[in-house]
């Protein structure tokens, strides 16, 4: 497969709280992160999320409160979903 990613991914396993407008709060685990986005492990992600869908997320379990970020669904894999960070308008 041709890798067209602009930013290098780094392994990172942390808890991420997703606040979804339809499904409510979901606690998921990240697999890796880059400057532009994050991959999260979600069982049956295709049945819960759609490409282009935007929602917020916040890393959990840090010594200080993490910022809430806007995330957009950009790709699916059998193990989860790729999300990109959205800039606030």
Identify the residue ranges that each predicted region occupies.
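Structured alpha-helical
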Residues: 1-89
């Amino acid at each position: 497969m041709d890798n067209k990613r602009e930013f290098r991914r780094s392994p990172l396993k942390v808890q991420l709280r997703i606040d979804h407008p339809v499904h409510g709060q979901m606690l998921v685990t990240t697999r890796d992160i880059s400057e532009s986005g994050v991959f999260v492990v979600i069982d049956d992600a295709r049945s819960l999320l759609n490409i282009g869908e935007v929602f917020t997320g916040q890393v959990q379990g840090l010594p200080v409160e993490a910022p809430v970020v806007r995330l957009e669904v950009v790709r699916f894999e059998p193990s989860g979903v790729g999300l990109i960070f959205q800039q606030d308008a």
